[in-house]
Amino acid sequence: MQANIKWLDDPEIFRVNQLPAHSDHPFFKNYREWQNNHSSFKQSLNGMWQFKFSKDPQSRPVDFYKKDFNTSSFTTIPVPSEIELNNFAQNQYINTLYPWEGKIFRRPAYALNKSDAEEGSFSEGKDNTVGSYIKHFDLNPELRDHDIHIVFEGAERAMYVWLNGHFIGYAEDSFTPSEFDLTKYIKEKDNILAVEVFKHSTASWLEDQDMFRFSGLFRSVELLAFPETHLVDLDLKPTVCDNYQDGIFNAELKFTGSLNGHVHLSVEDVNGSAILEQDVPLDSEVEFTSSTLENIHLWDNHHPYLYQLLIEVHDENGHLVELIPYQFGFRRIEINQDKVILLNGKCLIINGVNRHEWNAKTGRSITLNDMEKDIDTFKENNINAVRTCHYPNQIPWYYLCDQNGIYMMAENNLESHGTWQKMGQVEPSDNVPGSVPEWREAVIDRARNNYETFKNHTSILFWSLGNESYAGSNIVAMNEFYKEHDSSRLVHYEGVVHRPELKDQISDIESHMYLPPKEVAEYLRNNPQKPFMECEYMHDMGNSDGGMGSYIKLIDEYPQYVGGFIWDFIDQALLVYDPISKQNVLRYGGDFDDRHSDYEFSGDGLMFADRTPKPAMQEVRYYYGLHK
């Protein structure tokens, strides 16, 4: 198969040779590797890569992936990082519009005219910058003689991959891992990995989030080797019984490779005492189910109790070939007959924030240290919940939320604001995904990626279908996907407020943005059909968050009011050296000669971009502290 640049124009082509999404479980060779948190099955490709920036597809080095290509005109770029923050391209912050508005006329394929494929819209677009990446590497000795995959944790926005001159695959969906099989073409030494990243494709219509519009390999890249038998997917289903004291543990495991041997599974409490042990023969699919486990510890914000799961994979001689550790908790979320959301039988209260991934120096390419600082800030200010606005976050964030009892709304990578809201008005004539058949599989794929990757994380209480994408049959299909695959969580989507006739088919929650407290109370007084949530409220721009108490009072008055997520946690601003003041200063949208721009609207966080709290954080600490 050969790569085809026309895939950029086709909403029905969003993955080519990309492996199916699966659980994010770690795996190790033995217990020593686990204890040292180092897997010999992994090889990082982070670091300096050769790089060529092109202003449009026509000027890109088309044959750069070939082994004999002359790369003397290439420079270097660190991976992970944003292309724009390495001074190759223009920084631009936009809220609702698309980056090309006012410059190039585009409409989503098949949206206005069912026969209009919009051919050449992106493959010939003069505004579509391209990053051509090359990485030379040798395979670590520990990875040799194994099947080898490559995982790109995040690439904005469309990516083609070659290895040693051979086309490997194509991927979109910028914020979930893209995994490819390299086994057929990889060598022990002198490998040449080539990656071509386009800033725009049909995926751009689905990724119109309120943020700086970056591109490139902005998350880690790594190689994975697999032992002779490998756990490819883990699906945990810990269930809390009706008495909220006992539980049942179920796990479904899928294996690849040799199936001669056995699997040993154990579950330990925090003291290291086993509460469950089972041993079964290997098979392509294995299921473990416990009898009733009495007096289990429940997981919540106050007591984020996690059990330790250990899965040992043994070959036919009894030798350990793979160890899979995973922590999970028992918790139960449900809506009772009074339309009250209960967690472990008690009324759930969300003291939440919307959180973009952000670092003032590196943009959305953040570190574990950034995440840990944010968790500390949550705890200091009585924040107990987070919405991953408006895309899946880096995998370590989900583990941190599990460990620290942070309730999570796990949102899909979907926002198409600019296709239906124009000049502040609702005008959905060219909305996607809407009910356009050609866009359905792309958004179902995003839902599947989000679900399969993060399905085992106890902290996730809500799946969110996306943000500000209007509503239609494709959003209904996403809702149905989650309902079919996961009965242990609730589904959220705010955009259905614009299509009230679909409310019975979309979202378990009546979700709004910035609805005044009086109107919230009016809904709750009039026989509410669903519990109520503000998925965005208390817009934190400037000297803000006054009147927060009016919302918090609703928690005491109406048990159907679950609370909400403040918009938002941290400013999107960049630390830049100012030659006049000779100081590093924070610059916002519009400060980079970016036009069009939504200017300082990028600065509506409870913290400045350098993670210094704003005065409004005091208000949050006080009011969220009233219902810890």
Swiss-Prot record:
The gene is lacL. This is Beta-galactosidase large subunit. It comes from the Bacteria. The active site is at E468 (proton donor), E536 (nucleophile). One of its GO terms (cellular component) is beta-galactosidase complex. Signal peptide: none annotated. Its EC number is 3.2.1.23. It is an enzyme of class 3 (hydrolase). It catalyses: Hydrolysis of terminal non-reducing beta-D-galactose residues in beta-D-galactosides.
